[in-house]
Amino acid sequence: MKNIAVIPGSFDPITLGHLDIIKRSAGLFDVVHVSVLNNASKQGFFTIEERIEMISEAVKDIPNVEVEYFQGLLVDYCNKVGAKQIVRGLRAVSDFEYEMQLTSMNKKLDDDLETLYMMTNNQYSFISSSMTKDVAKYGGDVSSIVPPNVELALKQKYAEINRRP
């Protein structure tokens, strides 16, 4: 029986902090599903398809990582792919309260599902997708916080937005 984990997130866009958690999880599990969700409480900057493409490129050299889109309840998705673990990255203590609420609800819905928290390496602890977009929007250098393909995608997206009347 394979040891399967799910790393859910909006990944809008994926950062080196996300990639750190994905790589380390890939060393712990037989299969890691990076599951892209559409967060209704957030306005998406990149489309789901663009996010999946960027993540797939960033993880292409990690053979046991699969990238997929899902909608609906995370517990249902985990059951569909045979995962018994959810991996969540934590940047700081401030992330924990929200994550604990999610974990409690998932546990209420499926008592067999476990959530594992992984601290992001210190060099990535300040990075968020929102902050990354803000820096890129004003032409700041994001090369040290996102994979190269994401840096290019951000530049292209903002160039396109700035060309609009």
UniProtKB/Swiss-Prot annotation:
Pathway annotation from the record: Cofactor biosynthesis; coenzyme A biosynthesis; CoA from (R)-pantothenate: step 4/5
Site description Transition state stabilizer, residues in chain: 18
EC number in record: 2.7.7.3
Catalytic activity of the protein: (R)-4'-phosphopantetheine + ATP + H(+) = 3'-dephospho-CoA + diphosphate
UniProt-annotated binding residues for ATP: 10-11, 18, 89-91, 99, 124-130
Cofactor: Mg(2+)
Molecular-function GO term, any one: ATP binding
UniProt keyword Nucleotidyltransferase present: yes
A biological process term (GO) from this entry: coenzyme A biosynthetic process
Subcellular location: Cytoplasm
Tree of life domain: Bacteria
Binding residues for substrate: 10, 42, 74, 88
SUPFAM superfamilies: Nucleotidylyl transferase (SSF52374)
Enzymatic class: transferase
Keywords for this protein: ATP-binding, Coenzyme A biosynthesis, Cytoplasm, Magnesium, Nucleotide-binding, Nucleotidyltransferase, Transferase
Claim: Methyltransferase is one of the keywords in the record: no
Any one of the GO CC terms: cytoplasm
Oligomeric and partner information: Homohexamer.
Role: Reversibly transfers an adenylyl group from ATP to 4'-phosphopantetheine, yielding dephospho-CoA (dPCoA) and pyrophosphate.
HAMAP family: PPAT_bact
Similarity remark: Belongs to the bacterial CoaD family.
Protein name: Phosphopantetheine adenylyltransferase
Organism of origin: Macrococcus caseolyticus (strain JCSC5402) (Macrococcoides caseolyticum)
Top-level taxonomy: Bacteria, Bacillati, Bacillota, Bacilli, Bacillales
